């Protein structure tokens, strides 16, 4: 960990020094859930978020049944549902040959047979607010981690900077939950295994009307693909383009983009006219990767910091939160008792690595067999035969909904 501090420099000796049991870096879904679950168990937790608020681009708004069940176990599903939200009960592929229902969440055996659509800033504020009920929880916004504190090969906390200058936060365990561009992953020198998804995404919103479908829809045709998710009064739209082609799309202009969208989904042509400025469109560079080891002494990575997910299936948030829940299950007792060791960190990786690698393998296959084919203008897109057969077999047709809704392994909150 060459980027970490091996000793405290003299200029920092006069800065603020604080102590916590667990320092969580990153106020995304994994970070806030882990902080809440540890705080509930009596562990002293400090959560550092680099930004001044929770409202940022590319934050998915999906909350899957697995997350809702987990929140229900700690009494938070009902109050969460009081926030303004929408529900997606089905996911369909709109192909040139007609619609194909990919996932019907209503068939799942759960109290929450849908994907909840809730602005992520509201979800994060809700969970952070619940964590703030515990006196052993502290949230620092606008706190940017600069360095790791390392002593004898063990991470003992971080040096961060906020509006008051640099400060030292010492901790028995530091958790990197700081997303796909993880600062802690970089500082810790973690090795990544990367893959190259064939696409990037243009991310924007257009008006939605009450008579519109309430599901998640994916449109295919003419070498183009558009995913639309119900956000209540708006559609959250993801226009899928070939990897590295965003400059050409922008150079062609907004008129060309609106025309391509209208050709793909003519019934929404009028809505696409609302796109009048490139500032309304954000580009998401799609990537997929995982670290070979999730931990080093005193340091653990979870969520996108440990495994960057492709947006296929929209499961990244679900997996990040399951990482957090499993980490809390394993770590709460040893942290509270002062008995944490490397074996506990290894156990977190053991429980969560195989579901992550499995879903990434599935995503890779879908990217190769479905999305790459859909983006080839020389081909007429057709749903692969094996996939159509799967959806027709009663015992198998619920599998896509289950994998999207719950992943390959359910995680429960340890009593």
Task: Kindly give the residue locations of the regions a language model identified.
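C-terminal helical "tail/cap" subdomain of flavin- and related membrane-associated enzymes
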Residues: 2-9, 329-415
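Beta1/beta-strand and adjacent pyrophosphate-binding region of the FAD-binding site
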Residues: 13-30
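Glycine-rich FAD pyrophosphate-binding loop
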Residues: 25, 39-59
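Active-site-adjacent segment of FAD-dependent monooxygenases/related oxidoreductases
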Residues: 64-130
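A conserved short coil-to-beta-strand element within the FAD-binding core of flavoproteins
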Residues: 141-155
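Conserved FAD-binding catalytic core of PHBH/FMO-like flavoproteins
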Residues: 154-286, 290-291, 295
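Glycine-rich phosphate/pyrophosphate-binding beta-alpha loops
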Residues: 225, 288-291, 306-318, 354
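FAD-binding beta-loop-beta segment adjacent to the flavin cofactor pocket
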Residues: 285-301, 357-358, 375
